[in-house]
From Swiss-Prot:
Keyword presence, Nucleotidyltransferase: no
Protein name per the record: Holo-[acyl-carrier-protein] synthase
Cellular component GO terms held in the UniProt record: cytosol
PANTHER family: L-AMINOADIPATE-SEMIALDEHYDE DEHYDROGENASE-PHOSPHOPANTETHEINYL TRANSFERASE, PHOSPHOPANTETHEINE TRANSFERASE
Pfam (any one): ACPS
Encoding gene, per UniProt annotation: acpS
Record key words, sorted: Cytoplasm, Fatty acid biosynthesis, Fatty acid metabolism, Lipid biosynthesis, Lipid metabolism, Magnesium, Metal-binding, Transferase
Enzyme Commission numbers on file: 2.7.8.7
Biological processes annotated in GO: fatty acid biosynthetic process; lysine biosynthetic process via aminoadipic acid
Amino acid sequence: MIVGIGIDIVELERIQSLLERNRKFLDRILTPREREQFDQLAPARQVEFLAGRFAAKEAYAKALGTGIGRHVSFQDIEIVSDEYGKPSIAARRDGEVIHLSISHSRDYAIAQVIIERFGPAKPSDACHG
């Protein structure tokens, strides 16, 4: 059963501007492990990476139904990649599968998250978007 859907799109130029004005933006958005990955990338790829992670975390928070804020922060959400580069969200709750897709164009990064729960439905289960 799908219990949450979230999508987010961000302009690469906006992320580039935030990064140029305040490098602390990185520490707010990326976990230490994500920051290690970021630091190993070529400068041209860093903005795409950061924008994709930003969009993925926003999409996940929307799928949870909370958004980024009081209940979940950027640091609570970690995006990891498998050996083939496929991203996934490290946070998992029992009985849930989180589907994540991140894509980039020349100007934008977009991410979509779908949260599925297996087992008996709970009264609190509802789709958010």
